């Protein structure tokens, strides 16, 4: 038998009490950053079946951008999936984090804008992430990527 206290705790933590739209609006405020870091960025898309999955590429230098798009990549890559438990957040909310990671690590950062629940039930967000990883590993996102130099 579950105690009244435990029932109250479970009720408070249930998904029914999460205000998704309010949470998403608060997350959107994170992008209002006057100290935004300027790195080279490129928005592209990959496909999960018929669905286009937006992906943002962060290049630590102009040289990295040129190499990854035209000549063939020589930089290590970090494949990044933003937080939010498949329900909140976005690539835009993590823009500053990814830009700083690119600069601090001298890696190309690949950030995936996967679809969110509850509109898109699991495993749809995971499948969007897999589609981006597959495109990266098969050189569809960045030319001549060495799979041994990709960190997920």
Regions found by a protein language model. Give the residues of each.
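Short beta-to-alpha linker loops that shape the active-site pocket of alpha/beta-hydrolase fold enzymes
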Residues: 61, 113-117
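Alpha/beta-hydrolase fold nucleophile elbow
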Residues: 143-152
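Intrinsically disordered, low-complexity Ser/Thr- and acidic-rich flexible linkers and loops
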Residues: 63-72
């Amino acid at each position: 038998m579950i105690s009244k206290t435990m029932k109250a705790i479970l009720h408070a933590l249930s998904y029914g009490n999460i205000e998704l739209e309010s949470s998403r609006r608060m997350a959107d405020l994170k992008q209002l950053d006057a100290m935004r870091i300027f790195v080279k960025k490129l928005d592209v898309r990959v496909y999960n079946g018929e669905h286009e999955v937006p992906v943002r590429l962060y290049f630590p230098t102009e040289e990295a951008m040129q190499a990854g798009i035209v000549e063939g990549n020589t930089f290590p890559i970090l494949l990044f999936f933003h937080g939010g438990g498949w329900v909140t957040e976005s690539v835009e909310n993590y823009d500053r984090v990814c830009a700083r990671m690119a600069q601090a690590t001298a890696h190309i950062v690949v950030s995936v804008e996967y679809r969110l629940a509850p509109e898109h039930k699991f495993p749809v967000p995971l499948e969007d992430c897999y589609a981006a990883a597959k495109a990266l590993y098969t050189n569809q996102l960045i030319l001549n990527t060495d799979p041994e130099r990709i960190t997920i």
